[in-house]
């Protein structure tokens, strides 16, 4: 016996089939757009039904970047640079195909890269719940309408101060959680 195993499935049909065939659970990470992730969840549920297995939706984590602030402007001021840095690093790491060691300064790499990562605005619209309590509540309720029951919140965004992380978490607890 072993504890449940979760696999952060990608768009790959093979990965989804592997986890379904081996009775593993899916995990949705922040690297997928919400729309694509919901489509993947639909395919996961269909695959579970075809195999007569429970989909365990109450235990399937669906992760999003989350930052709650009193105003949208403050939320953006707090996290924009951090979200963009995360995207830079994720793109940078994909280029390290021959090694796991970083032997180049990220600023040097930024000067020679041939594509830009997703912007803050794109991440906010497609992978993040960033804004006022009301805006975040609306986004969470939209997920719930698709059967998502377990939201994983990435509050700590790449160098965001502990003070700002805790302020966001407190605001989430006080103004968002009671409504979801």
Language-model segments: which ranges?
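Hydrophobic faces of well-ordered beta-strands that scaffold small-molecule active sites
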Residues: 5-8, 24-29, 58-65, 151-153
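Conserved, mostly hydrophobic/aromatic
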Residues: 5, 19, 44, 75, ...
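C-terminal helical cap(s) of enzyme catalytic domains, especially alpha/beta-barrels
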Residues: 36-47, 160-180
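Internal, glycine-rich beta/alpha segment that forms the wall or movable "lid"
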Residues: 1-22, 35-42
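An alpha-helical appendage that flanks or caps ligand/catalytic pockets
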Residues: 35-146
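Active-site-proximal loop/turn and secondary-structure-junction residues that shape catalytic pockets
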Residues: 11, 32, 66-68, 157-159
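Long, low-complexity C-terminal extensions of enzymes
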Residues: 132-156, 160-173
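Glycine-enriched alpha-helix->loop->beta-strand junction motifs that scaffold or abut catalytic
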Residues: 18-27, 147
